[in-house]
Amino acid sequence: MELLVATLAHMVRDKDDDGITRMRLISETIQNAPGLVNARIYRSREPESYYFILTTWEDEDFWYKAQDRYNPTNLLRGATEELLTAYTEQWLMRYLWGYSRPFAQPTIAAAHIVTVRPEQAERVERSWIEGLRRLVTQPALAFAFLARERNEDRVILHDQSTVNNIKFAEASINNYSSNFLNVLSWPGETQRKDFYTDQNYKAISGFLSSVGVVRVLALDPM
């Protein structure tokens, strides 16, 4: 079964050119990994500076064998350590649902990370997939997927010297949460706005906010 590894890294704001150059080198390195199905790297669209790396592996065996040389977290530490401003977060996930519209070129994207209590996870999964299936009847989306964290493989990596990071990690790795990732891509800003004003999306968004904690990352593909 394919394994999705999502890695989020925050970097200093005034080193964008340096950060982009180093992330491209990391991307070139990852492409050589045995068992890699695909890799996507996004950078933030907001005033903050962060990068979101998505790698898909044929199965978990290939991923575990690639740890030393191709784990995005290790590559980030080796190439960008002085640019990192906070802990690096990494989730091991399984795909639940996906969509791609032929001939639509994704130019902007967003990642919705939702944390819920375990007893809500199955309900969230069913409701979210149903809502997304209704949304793709509209032509706004170019590409999208929904994934769910494998809780037993959760990895939160942080700077041991930073008290805040330690507190965050301790809170995040407990057994009282499940994480979902929904990545959405659009051909342009008009389609993105149309998507977010759709009543089906508003219904999903309201439901997710009522049962969990929602983070939204505004992204540009690299």
Name each model-derived stretch.
Residues 2-10, 52-54, 108-115, 181:
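Active-site-flanking beta-strand signature of metal-NTP-handling nucleotidyl enzymes
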Residues 10-21, 115-125:
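Short, surface-exposed ligand-recognition loops at beta-strand->loop->(often short) alpha-helix junctions
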Residues 28-37, 56-90, 135-142, 157-180, ...:
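An amphipathic, aromatic/His-enriched active-site/gating alpha helix that lines ligand/cofactor pockets
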Residues 40-42, 96-103, 167-172:
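Short beta-strand/turn micro-motifs at beta-sheet edges
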Residues 42-47, 147-152, 172-176:
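A short beta-turn/loop motif at secondary-structure boundaries
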Residues 44-56:
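N-terminal interaction modules that seed assembly of large macromolecular complexes
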Residues 77-137:
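Surface-exposed beta-loop interaction hotspot
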